[in-house]
Amino acid sequence: MTFYSAFTTFAAHFTFFKTNKNREMNNYELMVIFTPVLSEEEYKASQKKFTAFIKDNGGKVVHENPWGLKSLAYPIQKKTTGLYWVLEYDAPSDFNEKLKIQLLRDEHVLRFMATKLDKYAVEYNAKRRSGVPTATEKVEA
């Protein structure tokens, strides 16, 4: 009996080696900087492409926030401005590698950053969206 066949026989008896179809969903925030030469239609089409990709791979879009055209702190690919887009979504942890590949392949994307949100950041974002003042915001008297 080879090591591989012994290991697969051993692994077949334990459920922790099997893939779990009910994977735990994690909360993420994605910021993408698109090239500023996009038209409004292309900008929206790029956003829809990535939201559809998230949904097609078992994720759920929580909130979408297009910031529009902003100045960059330093030039990226000889561009001094970029179209910013922030997306909050829920997805399994193995999904982010697939999303990264899609973002790197897209010629309209200058930069991107995906961040895993902890429960406090999720609560903060939900409160901020609902209009409830958070601890860091000043309440006008």
Predicted regions: what is each one?
Residues 2-9, 13-21:
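Short, positively charged and aromatic/hydrophobic N-terminal segments
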Residues 3, 20-141:
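Structured, basic alpha/beta domains of bacterial-type, RNA-associated proteins
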